[in-house]
Design a protein with these regions (language model features):
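Conserved donor-binding loop and adjoining core beta-sheet/short helix segment
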Residues: 16-99, 211-241
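Conserved acetyl-CoA-binding loop-helix of GNAT-fold acetyltransferases
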Residues: 92-106, 132, 238-252
Length: 311
């Protein structure tokens, strides 16, 4: 078995693999709304050959493809997300998955990538294999789904996000997310910005912040067409979070359903979504990150006088 980038000589095998329906173990935000499909192996390979920004690796045994993985850039070119992870060898599924992930890591190192992300079902074989391949668990995540029916009709303190809110939004992330998760993924504002996923939003979609006593305490992003949104709030900011949910409901009113992927550590967010009528779907997801550089220690922020607290 050989794991490598696809070659033009793999064309016949790629076409055959396209016809084999297998679960994509890499879960992206937009596929939570549209279904967890994946770029076809042939299309992904062509994108790589044409240098269109997608990286592709195949696991080959003889003339047959046993698995495929693809990765795409996030906000920054030096941050990648694995958006396809499919194995088609039931007898060696773990070996195929691990080889694909290790090949992705090698390619990321060669491209001077700093972060390689993977989201997969928590109970999937890929979650176990990711740990063996050197990925660190950032956080567990739950999917909320339904129709937002806020208990409040006011959205006091909520306004549209602007570029000037970037650092304040990063501080909300620092206060809302446990330090163990931040150490795995993003400890600086540059890292936090680099790993943000914008693929699930259209250009016309937006973001919100909510302020309390002159300070930003919650943030959200939303996609009107799919009804999907993110929600991050500081602990104890229940009232402000409810106001943020009210504003989201207004902007997503035309969507057939509303969905949000929220970290399991987000007690404030969970409570607000439950009050607004959303329900948690069965199962959970695990977000992993392979860091290819060491994070900046948080103590350096303290010396610089930047107020960042533990989550």
């Amino acid at each position: 078995m050989n794991t490598r980038a696809p070659r033009p000589t793999d064309l016949v095998a790629l076409v055959t693999f396209d016809e084999d329906v297998r679960e994509n173990l890499a879960v992206t935000r937009e596929r939570l709304a549209h279904g967890n499909t994946a770029p076809t192996p042939l299309a992904a390979a062509i994108e790589q050959w044409l240098h269109l920004g997608r990286r592709t690796w195949v696991s080959v045994a003889g003339r047959q493809i046993r698995g495929i993985a693809t990765a795409r850039e996030l906000t920054a070119k030096h941050a990648w997300e694995i958006d396809t992870l499919i194995e088609a060898d039931d007898s060696q599924s773990r070996e195929v998955l691990e080889d694909l992930l290790r090949q992705a890591i090698v390619a990321a190192e060669n491209a001077e990538v700093t972060h390689l992300l993977l989201r997969t079902p928590e109970e999937s074989e890929a979650a176990e294999v990711a740990m063996r391949a050197g990925f660190a668990l950032v956080q567990g995540e739950r999917l909320w789904r339904g129709r937002l029916q806020p208990t409040s009709t006011t959205a006091n303190g909520v306004r549209e996000w602007s570029d000037a809110d970037a650092f304040a939004s990063f501080q909300v992330y620092c206060r809302a997310v446990p330090i163990s998760a931040r150490q795995c993924m993003a400890m600086t504002v540059d890292e936090w910005s680099a790993v943000r996923d914008r693929h699930w939003q259209e250009r016309s979609d937006g973001a919100l912040v909510v302020e309390h006593e002159g300070r930003v305490v919650g943030t959200a992003r939303y996609a009107r067409a799919t009804g999907q949104f993110t929600l991050t709030a500081e602990p104890e900011a229940q009232g402000a979070t409810d106001a943020l949910v009210t504003a989201l409901a207004r902007r997503l009113g035309d969507a057939e359903r509303h969905i949000a992927l929220v970290a399991v550590s987000g007690a404030t967010e969970d409570a607000a979504l439950r009050r607004a009528g959303l329900e948690v779907e069965p199962g959970a997801y695990a977000l992993f990150c392979k860091r290819l550089v060491h994070p900046v220690r948080e103590e350096s922020y303290a010396r610089a006088g930047i107020p960042i607290t533990g989550g």
